[in-house]
From Swiss-Prot:
Keywords: ATP-binding, Cell inner membrane, Cell membrane, Membrane, Nucleotide-binding, Translocase, Transport. It comes from Brucella melitensis biotype 1 (strain ATCC 23456 / CCUG 17765 / NCTC 10094 / 16M). It is a peripheral membrane protein. It comes from the Bacteria. GO terms for cellular component: plasma membrane. This is Putative ATP-binding protein BMEII0108.
């Protein structure tokens, strides 16, 4: 089966700074992948390339069989900062198909409610792929857990392909089929860790020794990396 998203030797430079170095990654149709790594490892850069907001300096990305040359309706994007139009009501923010929300402005909503609205708006457009850049990062711990469960419930019904960036290792393991660990300076793929835990995910799974073992493996991978220099990378070291 062909992957839904393919990063093929993707390189991204900002002037003399190498942000992404030869990223190769396939994400299967219907897969839920989380991406973790230290600050500056290129997680958001990779997602912006996947959405078409950035064009890579080298290599390319395919969605299905089509090269990504810009944003497209088959890709929905959800950001940490909610990305709602403050001058529109909640109803208007999700007007692509959801009509049973209250006629309130986003400023009247809590953080969790704003993010529910943003996710609902993305889902209402019926994208094949959801690109999520730390969508729960600004939420309190309890709301964050509830949002994780709601997202997994929606994903389990429709199995859209999800690429989800997070700094939270527990969140990465709880949500994903696979955890993509990136390394920094330059940003590159470090390793891929499978999450062999059943769905639906529950509180019992969070507390299980199997979950702890995977979490510890991801934690060790993220926090025990040595950044390379551009010169080392260019020599393949």
């Amino acid at each position: 089966m062909k992957p839904k998203i393919s990063f093929n030797n993707v390189v991204m430079r900002y002037g003399g700074f190498l942000a992404l170095d030869r990223l190769n990654l396939d994400i299967a149709d219907g897969e839920f992948v989380t991406v973790v790594g230290p600050s500056g490892c290129g997680k958001s850069t990779a997602m912006n390339i996947a959405d078409g907001l950035l064009q890579p300096s080298g290599g390319g990305i395919l969605v299905g069989d089509k090269p990504v040359t810009g944003p497209g309706p088959e890709r929905g994007v959800i950001f940490q900062q909610y990305a709602l139009f403050p001058w529109l009501t909640v109803r208007q923010n999700v007007e692509f198909g959801l009509t049973d929300f209250a006629d309130a402005l986003p400023k009247a909503l809590s953080g969790g409610m704003k993010q529910r609205c943003a996710i609902a708006r993305a889902y209402a457009a019926a994208p094949e792929i959801l690109l999520m850049d730390e969508p729960f990062g600004a939420l309190d711990a309890l709301t964050r857990v509830h949002m994780q469960d709601q997202l997994l419930d929606a994903w389990s019904r429709e199995r859209r392909t999800v690429m989800f960036i997070t700094h939270d290792v527990d969140e990465a393991v709880y949500l994903a089929n696979r955890v993509i660990v990136m390394a920094a300076r330059p940003g590159r793929l470090d390793q891929i860790i499978p999450v062999d835990l059943p769905y639906p995910r529950t509180e019992a799974i969070r507390l299980s020794p199997e979950f702890a073992a995977i979490r510890n493996r991801v934690w060790h991978a993220v926090y025990h990396q040595q950044p390379q220099t551009d010169q080392q990378s260019s020599h393949g070291q």
